């Protein structure tokens, strides 16, 4: 599990994409490659607020491996590492 010095806000999740190893040695331009949809949760926010102002805790935790929507989130780079920040609702499943 990785750690990063970023404070994720609200119901956002910081994901480190896991890229699948390619077989066959064919090199594709980055625009033709399929974006990763699997990653590791690196950091989570404190949750959104309900109508009473109370925090609603996220269901994922740091270290979880997850599947997420292919075009979800915003790609960010921090300390020469690439991450994706997205809403927890863009996560599809936790891998057990």
Swiss-Prot record:
Together with the chaperonin GroEL, plays an essential role in assisting protein folding. The GroEL-GroES system forms a nano-cage that allows encapsulation of the non-native substrate proteins and provides a physical environment optimized to promote and accelerate protein folding. GroES binds to the apical surface of the GroEL ring, thereby capping the opening of the GroEL channel. It is found in: Cytoplasm. Transmembrane segments: none annotated. The lineage of its organism: Bacteria, Pseudomonadati, Pseudomonadota, Alphaproteobacteria, Rickettsiales. One of its GO terms (cellular component) is cytoplasm. Belongs to the GroES chaperonin family. Signal peptide: none annotated. Heptamer of 7 subunits arranged in a ring. Interacts with the chaperonin GroEL. HAMAP family: CH10 (MF_00580). SUPFAM superfamilies: GroES-like. It comes from Wolbachia pipientis subsp. Culex pipiens (strain wPip). One of its GO terms (molecular function) is ATP binding. The keyword Cytoplasm applies. This is Co-chaperonin GroES. GO terms for biological process: chaperone cofactor-dependent protein refolding. PANTHER family: 10 KDA HEAT SHOCK PROTEIN (PTHR10772), CO-CHAPERONIN GROES (PTHR10772:SF58). Keywords: Chaperone, Cytoplasm.
């Amino acid at each position: 599990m990785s750690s990063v010095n970023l404070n994720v806000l609200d119901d956002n999740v910081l994901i480190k994409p896991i890229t699948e190893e390619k077989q066959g040695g064919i090199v594709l331009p980055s625009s033709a490659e399929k974006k990763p949809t699997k990653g590791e949760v690196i950091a989570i926010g404190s949750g959104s607020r309900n109508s009473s102002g109370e925090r609603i805790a996220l269901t994922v935790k740091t270290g979880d491996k997850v599947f997420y929507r292919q075009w979800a989130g915003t790609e960010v780079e921090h300390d020469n590492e690439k991450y994706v920040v997205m809403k927890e609702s863009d996560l599809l499943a936790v891998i057990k």
